[in-house]
Swiss-Prot record:
One of its GO terms (cellular component) is cytosol. This is Translational regulator CsrA. It comes from Geotalea uraniireducens (strain Rf4). A translational regulator that binds mRNA to regulate translation initiation and/or mRNA stability. Usually binds in the 5'-UTR at or near the Shine-Dalgarno sequence preventing ribosome-binding, thus repressing translation. Its main target seems to be the major flagellin gene, while its function is anatagonized by FliW. Disulfide bonds: none annotated. SUPFAM superfamilies: CsrA-like. It holds the Pfam family CsrA.
Length: 79
């Protein structure tokens, strides 16, 4: 992990398209400004981890779930 020291108004550039600037420091909180392409997703880490967990949960299905779904689809009356 790269650890840098920055003052208010100073920035860090990542690659050619991402710039992170220290906007404000209050007590133990640091406010960051991030300039990045609009198509790049930027999340706070706790939100990112929550989304990952929800995705894992949604992808976690079992054979019984599939059999139940097939049964429901096949239970309609056919004439």
């Amino acid at each position: 992990m790269l650890v840098l020291t920055r003052k208010i108004g100073e920035a860090v550039t990542i690659g050619d398209q991402i710039r992170i600037m220290v906007v404000e420091v209050k007590g133990n909180q640091v406010r960051l400004g991030i300039e990045a392409p609009q198509d790049m997703r930027i999340y706070r880490e706790e939100i990112y981890l929550q989304v990952q967990e929800e995705n894992r949960h949604a992808a976690d299905w079992n054979l019984t779930d599939l059999e139940n779904a097939v049964s429901l689809l096949g239970s309609g009356d056919k004439e």
